[in-house]
Structure formats: C-alpha cells, structure tokens
C-alpha cells in the first residue's frame, strides 16, 4: 500500500475506535469520567475492564463515526482536561496495581485559545513526566493517527505498538509541507520524507510491534489485539518494578 492510501486509511472515519477496542477486548468495561478539576472531555475516554482475571485500566482518544459524534468528541482532539482525566485514571491504576493500556487516534491536541488558557502544554508535559515513572506496566497502541505531542501524551509506555495502517508523526504531512515548502498540496511528498508508517517506524525502533490488518474483519482484528495484549501484559507483569522502569527510561532515552 502506498503512503497516500495508508494516510487515508489511518484517517478513515469508519476505522475502529478506542471504545470499539475497549468493549471488544475487555470484559465488563466501565467508563469513568471527568478530570475532577474542570469538566469531562469527550475526546478522551477511559475506564476499567477485565482481561481474563486481570483488571486493566484503559485510556484512549476517541474519534466519532458521524458528524454529531465528532462534534461531541471534538474530532479526536483532546483539551487539557482530557489529558488530566487520562492521568487521573493512570494514577488510580498505579494506586491499585492495575496495568494500563492506551489507544491513540488523534491528529493532535486541540490548539484552541481556551485549551491554551487552561494549560494544554502543561497537561501534556505532566503526562509525559508521570507516565515515565508510573509504577505499573503500560502498553500504548496507535490505532489510526498518532499526531504530535497530543499522541505522545498517552504513548510513554513500556511497549508501543501500531496497527499496520496507522501513522505516527511529529505533525501532519500537510503541516510539514506547509512549513517546508509553503505548499500544503505536497503533503504526500512530505509523508514520504517523514517516515510515518508502521513498518518504517518499526525499522527505526520507534515502535515495538506492528499488528497486521491484512484480510482481517473488525472482530478478527480485535481478537488479534486481545491475544497480543494477554501475552505481553503477562510478560511485563513478571518483571521486577525497578527493571520495568529502567527499561522504559532507556527506551525513550535512546532517541
């Protein structure tokens, strides 16, 4: 698949969402709401579910599948209260010894005036700091777009995976082309230079695993992700805490 098709597929409105994975993978998934400071952000969803006999905290960025739903979800662009909700749930997971799984699909954090006034940069930075030392296993999965710091704020993890037809980048190809050439129409040319596809990033050790989507139905893909999570969470849970945190630190330090 060429780069243009991959970008289109990553942005496809009908693509599986965080809630699709959360309800399909985890038994008895219960959503939790609010950041306990300002409000609940519909762009970030999270809660608790069971993976076998293991309670897991699930957090992710949610896009809509219709115009009305996208308005509710702010087109998958979180406000600072969304990142603070995510952090609240992750700290709760740490308190009760639950591993964390995050699902990421965003063009980036919302850049509006209100979001900036409420501390968008601080919220993202705090997530990076807190996740780097969170004392439970973390697995992050990019399921569509992984855009800039808005994606990274949920991706400081022990394992970072990508669905095969997803992308992960410092900014959009359109933004890159506009900055580099002052011409947003050269977006796909920019995408080639940026190395944003799953297999390119796996080759560069930015991500740890690519989950194949070829020939799989939605149910089969969810089942595949569930199997991978069960295996990897069992492995990570066996690691001594000091070793887990040191490996997480070194994983990001090497960049």
Curated annotation (Swiss-Prot):
Subunit text: Acetyl-CoA carboxylase is a heterohexamer composed of biotin carboxyl carrier protein (AccB), biotin carboxylase (AccC) and two subunits each of ACCase subunit alpha (AccA) and ACCase subunit beta (AccD).
Reaction equations catalysed: N(6)-carboxybiotinyl-L-lysyl-[protein] + acetyl-CoA = N(6)-biotinyl-L-lysyl-[protein] + malonyl-CoA
Gene designation per UniProt: accA
Gene Ontology biological-process annotations: fatty acid biosynthetic process; malonyl-CoA biosynthetic process
HAMAP family: AcetylCoA_CT_alpha (MF_00823)
Lineage top rank: taxon: Bacteria
Residues of the CoA carboxyltransferase C-terminal domain: 1-235
Major localization listed first in the record, in broad terms: cytoplasm
Family of this protein: Belongs to the AccA family.
Pfam families, alphabetized: ACCA (PF03255)
EC number(s) per entry: 2.1.3.15
Name the UniProt record assigns to this protein: Acetyl-coenzyme A carboxylase carboxyl transferase subunit alpha
Keyword field: ATP-binding, Cytoplasm, Fatty acid biosynthesis, Fatty acid metabolism, Lipid biosynthesis, Lipid metabolism, Nucleotide-binding, Transferase
Cellular component terms (Gene Ontology): acetyl-CoA carboxylase complex
Location in or out of the cell: Cytoplasm
Enzyme class, broadest EC rank: transferase
InterPro entries: Acetyl_CoA_COase_a_su, ClpP/crotonase-like_dom_sf, COA_CT_C
Involved pathway(s): Lipid metabolism; malonyl-CoA biosynthesis; malonyl-CoA from acetyl-CoA: step 1/1
Taxonomic lineage: Bacteria, Bacillati, Bacillota, Bacilli, Lactobacillales
The species this protein was found in: Streptococcus pneumoniae serotype 2 (strain D39 / NCTC 7466)
């Amino acid at each position: 698949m060429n780069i243009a098709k991959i970008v289109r597929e990553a942005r496809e409105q009908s693509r599986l969402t965080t809630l699709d994975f959360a309800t399909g993978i985890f038994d008895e998934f219960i959503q939790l709401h609010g950041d306990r400071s300002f409000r609940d952000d519909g762009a970030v969803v999270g809660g608790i579910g069971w993976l076998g006999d293991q309670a897991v905290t699930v957090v992710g960025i949610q896009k809509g599948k219709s115009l009305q739903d996208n308005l509710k979800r702010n087109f998958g662009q979180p406000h600072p209260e969304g990142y603070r909700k995510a952090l609240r749930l992750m700290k709760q997971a740490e308190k009760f010894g639950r591993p964390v799984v995050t699902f990421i699909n965003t063009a980036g954090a919302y850049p509006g005036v209100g979001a900036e006034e409420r501390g968008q940069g601080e919220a993202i930075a705090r997530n990076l700091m807190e996740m780097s030392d969170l004392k439970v296993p973390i697995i992050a999965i990019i399921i569509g777009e992984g855009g800039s710091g808005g994606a990274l704020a949920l991706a400081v993890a022990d394992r970072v995976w990508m669905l095969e037809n997803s992308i992960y980048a410092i900014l959009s190809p359109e933004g890159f082309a506009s900055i580099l050439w002052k011409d947003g129409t050269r977006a796909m040319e920019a995408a080639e230079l940026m190395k944003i596809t799953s297999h390119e990033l796996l080759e560069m050790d930015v991500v740890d695993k690519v989950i194949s989507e070829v020939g799989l139905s939605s149910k089969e893909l969810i089942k595949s992700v569930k199997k991978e999570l069960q295996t990897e969470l069992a492995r990570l849970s066996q690691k001594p805490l000091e070793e887990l945190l040191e490996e997480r630190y070194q994983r990001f330090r090497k960049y």
